[in-house]
Amino acid sequence: MLKKMGEAVARVARKVNETVESGSDTLDLAECKLVSFPIGIYKVLRNVSGQIHLITLANNELKSLTSKFMTTFSQLRELHLEGNFLHRLPSEVSALQHLKAIDLSRNQFQDFPEQLTALPALETINLEENEIVDVPVEKLAAMPALRSINLRFNPLNAEVRVIAPPLIKFDMLMSPEGARAPLP
């Protein structure tokens, strides 16, 4: 067990160092068994955090993200958080004014993260396979850049299914009523 933990820590350190040394705009920490975003990474990336445009934290064990994460990486264009245990986003997600795409699929959201509706550049939202029942259709319809929202395999209420289509100017992907996600 300790050996596996040590390997995971070494893998994270290696990936962070690669990002810093190469001057990359991408930080890929997918499948690193993270339960939280490592605090030490903020210090290591302090001189390059503004040039990070894509972060992948997919398929970890994250239960939450801190406000510091959102404000430190305020220049993000893409954020991949799929396959975690997230159920909410911090209000500081509003700092991500340049964010174009966010993937929150396969998490534990029961409520639609309404803070996303305030992001002016956001084009794509993926919330597939969560537990969302209601969606702020009017707020989504007012988003200037939104092109696509994926809500497949969420137990959406009938009202959303009826009200949304005539109000929206973007693609809204929904499963047939009562459909459940396929087993992995």
UniProtKB/Swiss-Prot annotation:
Domain of life of the source: Eukaryota
Q: List the disulfide bonds.
A: none
Q: Which SUPFAM superfamilies match?
A: L domain-like
Which positions carry Phosphoserine?
S175
Q: One Pfam family name from the record?
A: LRR_8
Q: Keywords of this protein's UniProt record, alphabetized? A: Leucine-rich repeat, Phosphoprotein, Repeat
Q: Where are the LRR repeats?
A: 51-72, 75-96, 98-120, 121-141, 145-167
Q: What name has this protein been given in UniProt?
A: Leucine-rich repeat-containing protein 20
Organism equals Homo sapiens (Human)
Q: What is the lineage of its organism?
A: Eukaryota, Metazoa, Chordata, Craniata, Vertebrata
Q: Which gene encodes it?
A: LRRC20
